[in-house]
């Protein structure tokens, strides 16, 4: 959450867009070069020199080594690896409606707190819950334990109640060609609001945005049906469902739970349409741009001194262009890697089929970026959220006994904290890319049963993953503001 609110009113006269593209491409070309950089802790207020060049080189080599090892393994070995399950127990859906109704009630209270509670984003539970507990904490839990959002989302329970009270009405069908495009557009709007809007932390502003989104989504579910709109229109459900495929908990159609390897559920996923592929790439590019947009390098492109940041209002145009450009460049690089891989393997599969299947390997990378990028915010702002929930309307309440808790911001401040935080973040980034290579190989064998062709098809995509590993570590290490 930190760093989203407007930081000043001074405006500057720049013409940044004309200068941006060549310089932006330059940084993507230069980031693979391992050079000393500055590591940062929460909000990057503390920087110290660390041998990050060794981490960058080591991360790139680890991802490359993963590809080489997998290329030499027999296909049946990995097939047995992915299919292993440890059965647990059955878990029914009986309480799902009640849990969703409780979630909706909590959401309504948060909206009221946003409108009538404290104006301080670190004291009001609405921005802390949405930007920290939901967008960071729940994404992490979803990636570890599976689709918790299907129970926690605030639409399912109210939809069931309305359907029961007024009966099942005839619903309109969404055109098949729409696919995930509604969710893509809404996710792009969400990313713009989070990263570009001058004050997404403002409680009242966020309350109006979140409340309006809930109403529009609920209306769409009544018109087009809960399942159809959830699968292709409601971006949070689409995103959380995709992330849940990486989890180590699997639930079959009979409701039985079992342990599986991380990413195992991605191997059997159906190919995504063009819109689904675009959605996953947007999920990765948006969090990547969030990191890039705060770097000294980014500000330097436009002659902005990061120590005299003019405020988010002054960089709305720059940010909007950068958000879109980041998606376009990532999508172009991904498609190019798929095209080259298909040609190397002599594949007869269409580009859409290959890209729609292999894009599932982006999920571990997107999840790793999300966790690594927002880890410091989760550790600090999560404490503020726990405190704020005890007194949602700033009336002096202490509902859970946490209103007066001491916030331990030192957990991410200082040289020692910067060292361990950098190591955890770097480890998450590297592990995410290594798992992505593993998943990509499993998916490639579905396209190319011949092991040699499967390995050849993955070479360009692995090069892209190595480059993105370096880029991700550079983002974590380079000096940044905000």
Tell what function each PLM region has.
Residues 42-58, 120-131, 266-267, 304-321, ...:
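Membrane-interface segments at the starts/ends of alpha-helical transmembrane spans
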Residues 164-366, 376-379, 383:
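Long, contiguous internal "core" modules enriched in hydrophobic/ aromatic residues
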Residues 15-39:
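N-terminal secretory/membrane targeting signals
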Residues 39, 55-260, 289:
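Transmembrane-helix bundle segments that line or gate the permeation/cavity pathway
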